[in-house]
Swiss-Prot record:
Keyword terms, alphabetized: Glycoprotein, Magnesium, Membrane, Metal-binding, Transferase, Transmembrane, Transmembrane helix
Residues carrying sugar: N154
Residues that coordinate or bind dimethylallyl diphosphate: R126, K210, T211, Q240, N247, K257
Recorded superkingdom: Eukaryota
Encoding gene (name): ptmC
Transmembrane segments: 17-37
Lineage start: Eukaryota, Fungi, Dikarya, Ascomycota, Pezizomycotina
Protein name: Prenyl transferase ptmC
GO BP term, pick one: alcohol biosynthetic process
Source organism (scientific name): Penicillium ochrochloron
Cell location: Membrane
Binding site residues for Mg(2+) 1: D117, D121
UniProt cross-references to CDD domains, sorted A to Z: Trans_IPPS (cd00867)
Length: 342
């Protein structure tokens, strides 16, 4: 009978075996960490982008002393002027004081809403520039927005009292729509309809309040009647659709915002997101809204950017824009919606 002899491993072999064991263990740990990180939302303070944008000294980023002046510089003064000219071509000459007041009101309401929106959304950029609250801080930015809106309300009441009721009513509707959107974000989907048609209708009603009221306000201020409500509502709905779609479909928009699918990561509903909930694999969208981990967001984006959802969004944009092309030419926003399934 042959006896098997075993010899102890040499020192080099033992070292190699130990190194191999450590390497395998380290790789396993990396895989576990990656899977864990990929499945859970990362704290915003871990983002290098989040750390770099904020400035302790606003003067190092802009010479403008307040958030409102800063965002107004980005968009330009009186950016609603083309719409006013279309609604009333001679207002600038017939009543220059009212003409200027209408433009001041529209700038103040629109831009101040964006200041607060960017805080709510945690946005880092606005049109490729640092968002105002990332320069001046959330508290000063929000307070300046409230201050400017209060100033414009007082100026309207004292100087143009016949315009004040229109402004107050439409501003209330805008904020009601914004509040509804924020409640959905806070509560998740438990208070949102489940049937596809009901979901789309609920979202469109919110958009009509939040965005539609802003556009209708312009018609109310210029014409002092409701004769353009239907047209302004349609222009507003297209604007909302365009904004929603570019958030998930536009490479250009993602570069300017410094984020892809910001609405989804923030747990905020948009038209493509609402449609995707009822698409095949729509449960990924629900999961991403509840827990926006990289894994959930990637899978949700795959559904949102699917051919079916993309085609439904493009069809709605085409239908809503068919009768308002002259108004959309004034709006002038044409981001290329080129992102597809991932």
């Amino acid at each position: 009978m042959t006896t098997m002899l075993t010899t102890p491993l040499s020192g080099w072999s033992q070292l190699s075996l130990s190194f191999l064991t450590l390497t395998v263990g380290a790789l396993a740990l990396i895989v576990v960490l990656y899977i864990s990180i990929d499945r859970f939302p990362a704290p915003r303070w871990l983002s290098k982008k989040y750390q770099l944008i904020g400035q302790k000294d606003p003067a190092s980023t802009t010479s403008l002393e307040c958030p409102y002046s800063y965002i107004r510089q980005i968009y330009g003064h009186y950016h609603w002027a083309p719409f006013v000219h279309k609604l009333s071509p001679t207002l600038q000459y017939d009543d220059p004081a009212k003409y200027k007041m209408v433009l001041e009101i529209m700038d103040a309401i629109h831009l101040c809403l964006m200041l607060v929106d960017d805080i709510s959304d945690g946005s880092d950029f606005r049109k490729g520039r640092p968002a105002a609250h990332r320069i001046y801080g959330p508290s000063e930015t929000a307070n300046r927005a409230y201050l400017r809106v209060t100033q414009i309300l007082n100026q309207t009441t004292s100087g143009f009292p016949h315009l004040a009721p229109w402004l107050m009513r439409d501003l209330e509707n805008i904020l009601e729509g914004q509040d509804l959107s924020l409640v959905w974000r806070r509560d998740g989907l438990k208070n949102f309809p489940t049937a596809p048609l009901e979901r789309a209708a609920a979202y469109q009603r919110m958009a009509s309040l939040k965005t539609g009221s802003l556009f209708r306000l312009l018609g109310h201020l210029v014409l002092e009647d409701r004769s353009m409500d239907d047209t302004m509502t349609l222009v507003a709905w297209y604007s909302q659709l365009q904004n929603d779609c570019k958030n998930v479909y536009s490479t250009e928009y993602a570069k300017m915002k410094g984020a892809i699918a910001e609405d989804l990561s923030n747990g905020e509903l948009s038209y493509p997101i609402v449609l995707a909930m009822n698409a095949p694999d729509g449960h990924w969208v629900d999961l991403a809204l509840q827990s926006p981990s990289p894994w959930n967001v990637r899978n949700a984006l795959r559904v949102i950017r699917s051919d079916k959802v993309h085609q439904m969004c493009m069809a709605e944009m085409a239908e809503s824009s068919s009768s308002i092309q002259d108004w959309l030419a004034l709006w002038g926003r044409k981001e290329k919606l080129d992102l597809k399934s991932v």
